[in-house]
Amino acid sequence: LQINSSLFGETGQSSKLAAEFAASLAATTGARLVVRDLAHNPVPHLTAERFTAFATPVAERNLDQQRHVAESDALIEELRAADTVVLGLPMYNFGVPSTLKAYFDHLARAGVTFRYTAEGPVGLLGGKRAYVLATRGGRYAGTATDMQTAFVRQFLGFIGLRDVEFIYAEGLALGPE
């Protein structure tokens, strides 16, 4: 599963890198490549209505809640079906694109992608490898201003993806100085 989160869709730097990486991986392994472009097919941002729908027991959901949950379920099933995840991740104002945050909000579902235990939450989507192609205009990896890496690693681990490799392309907007 290749996930593009650039505002510029497939023409964004992170999307281009992710596409090249995913195509190479698919050619090497013979895997089928599925692409989710969050710019062209954005996931709705989380609302109180959607959040409530996710928490409502199945038998008690009204039609709107069923529709909201079905959208989330489709995203989760797409991820569950993937053996490998390739995420194109541009940095905007030191963080992740809001479209990616919205996507993550639809993936984080108690009892579906994680469960609570006495020892804390346990992710339910394990057994996958994730590659994160992170593009930045400046140089941020390993500094206090790199809030992306910790956030994305934490979220992916939360839902069970613990085998995560970050590949950085930095300094893409630096001038000659």
Range-by-range predicted roles:
Residues 1, 34-36, 131-133, 165-167:
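Hydrophobic/aromatic beta-strand patches that form the interior of the parallel beta-sheet core
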Residues 5, 135, 169:
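Cofactor-binding loop segments of dinucleotide-utilizing enzymes, especially the Rossmann-like FAD-
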Residues 7-9, 137-140, 173:
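Short histidine/acidic/glycine/proline-rich micro-motifs that form metal-
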Residues 23, 142-177:
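Glycine-rich phosphate/pyrophosphate-binding loop and the adjoining helix
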Residues 30-32, 127, 161-163:
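A generic structural signal for alpha->beta connector loops
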